[in-house]
Regions:
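ATP-binding pocket architecture of kinase catalytic cores
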Residues: 10-31, 37-111
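Active-site activation/catalytic loop segments of kinase-like enzymes and analogous catalytic loops
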Residues: 208-250, 266-274
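Hydrophobic "anchor" residues on beta-strands that sit immediately upstream
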Residues: 11, 69, 172-174, 194-196, ...
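Alpha-helical transmembrane segments of bacterial inner-membrane membrane proteins
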Residues: 53-57, 113, 124, 238-242
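ATP-dependent phospho-/nucleotidyl transfer catalytic cores
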Residues: 15-26, 75-95, 106-176, 181-195, ...
Length: 274
């Protein structure tokens, strides 16, 4: 990702698209174009949604020398935090993601491309784990026996969201799928949420996938912290995020009681994956 500054002082974000992870670049950019153009009709704030800069051929990206590139307008007077400095920062990230959900409530989610198939299909992640355990290619499974037993004991519970989606008990929605604090831009002066960024993983799914925000933001240590005595879940941060998210997304009624399950499932899914 580059900051490009023109002679006139106009600033842009130039990004190389990760075509190794996202093989269908055209589908990915169709998703981003459709979602950002839809959001543009719902807000009067030019900083309230990312703005793609089209090529001279009116395309949303450029393919050159075996690489794919895209450009956004730079969102001026904004900041991006890696970790919340205050509870209000975390609250505002919840407002950002909740607003994103609310504004896209009537977007036809089924029309979106699945840029990473089965990304938050937790039962499928368990299937991959079981296959790997059976092969045990590095002969390390015995070293983490207790952790494996912990995960497998909760396998049925962790299928709740996917089962509810399949049964039609939860609505299919536009989901961001990477709802970390650093994917919400805040106003540099007021610290209020402006817009959601990093839209590569926007796909159809359940709003409960936003529970990944809790896994990341309510943790008392970095996700790669090796000293596990430092790692807990802050219930206060959980309350702060839930309050901001629900207030920003009053249309989120179906599955409201499953919000805590979203946080549990996304946390377990991460553990099963890695």
């Amino acid at each position: 990702t580059y900051l490009a500054v023109t002679e006139s002082g106009r600033r842009y974000i130039l990004q190389k698209i990760n075509s190794n992870t996202f093989r269908d670049v055209a589908g990915l950019m169709e998703n981003i174009t459709a979602v950002t153009e839809f959001l543009r009709t719902k807000t009067d704030d030019p900083r309230g949604v990312l703005t793609l800069v089209k090529t001279h051929d009116s395309a949303s990206y450029l393919h050159a020398q075996d690489a794919y590139w895209r450009t956004y307008d730079f969102v001026e007077d904004s900041i991006c935090l890696q970790l919340p400095e205050t509870d209000e920062d975390f609250y505002q990230s919840a407002v950002g993601f909740g607003t994103f959900q609310q504004l896209l409530t009537d977007f036809p989610a089924a029309k979106l491309h699945e840029t990473i198939p089965n990304f938050h299909n937790t039962p499928d992640r368990y299937r991959a784990l079981l296959e790997t355990l059976e092969r045990d290619p590095m002969h390390r499974a015995a070293q983490v026996r207790l952790e494996i037993e912990f995960a497998l004991a909760r396998q049925a519970e962790m299928a709740a969201i996917q089962n509810a989606l399949a049964a039609g008990e939860l609505p299919l929605r536009v989901t961001h799928n990477d709802t970390k604090l650093n994917n919400v831009l805040l106003d540099a002066k007021t610290r209020r949420a402006l817009c959601v960024i990093d839209l590569d993983t926007v796909m159809p799914g359940s709003s409960l996938y936003d529970g990944d925000s809790i896994r990341f933001g309510a943790a008392t240590a970095a996700e790669d912290e090796k000293d596990l005595s430092k790692m807990e879940m802050s219930l206060e941060r959980f309350r702060v995020f839930t309050r901001g998210y629900v207030r920003a997304c009053p249309g989120l009624t179906a599955g409201l009681e499953l919000l805590p399950m979203g946080a549990k499932t996304m946390t377990m899914e991460c553990g099963v994956r890695f």
